[in-house]
Amino acid sequence: MYKVLLVDDEALIREAISENTRWKELGYELMGTCKNGREAIERLDQEEADLVLTDICMPYVDGMELTRYLYEKHKGVKVIIISGYDDFEYAKTAVKYQVMDYILKPITAKELAQTLTRVKEKLDEERFQRSDMKRIRGAYMSNLPILRGRFLNSLLMGNVGAQEIQEKLKDY
């Protein structure tokens, strides 16, 4: 399950999305809602989310400022913007901060579910790659003593060139 934070200054929008989205079926857990970006930042500094759904126009800290903050401070958090503004500048900024999707209001539950499904596939892929890298790193670390031993044997037997020695010294 991926944790989602919903950020929108309109209570009706927060309520509609919260209640009409089948979070668990889609592989998500709604960790909460916030009415502006400032509240979201405070929440995200306390508890990590995997995905933030945010509006753009909100008081105090708007959705673009929130997106920039997440891009700079919480690199792993993905963002979907749900906005009533069809402005090219917003879209350009969203691309700059690697927003996963930019959805225009009004949005149906079906459209949101399709978007969440696509994003979940990307999140699953990233999670798999991280776990695969972790597994490979673990295997390398457990075999490192053997690799060092083989290298030492090669050194003692004189089977290693100067350049290979330099490369192996960096690795081991």
Question: What spans do the regions from the language model cover?
Answer:
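Interdomain helical linkers/hinges and coiled-coil/dimerization scaffolds
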Residues: 107-172
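Acidic catalytic/metal-coordinating carboxylates
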Residues: 36-39, 62-65, 83
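Acidic, metal-coordinating helix/loop segments flanking the phosphotransfer/catalytic sites
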Residues: 33-51
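Short amphipathic alpha-helix used as the core "switch/output" element in two-component signaling
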Residues: 42, 64-75
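Active-site residues of response regulator receiver
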Residues: 8, 55
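Two-component/phosphorelay signaling modules centered on CheY-like receiver
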Residues: 11-32
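Receiver (REC) domain active-site loop signature in two-component systems and cognate sites
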Residues: 58
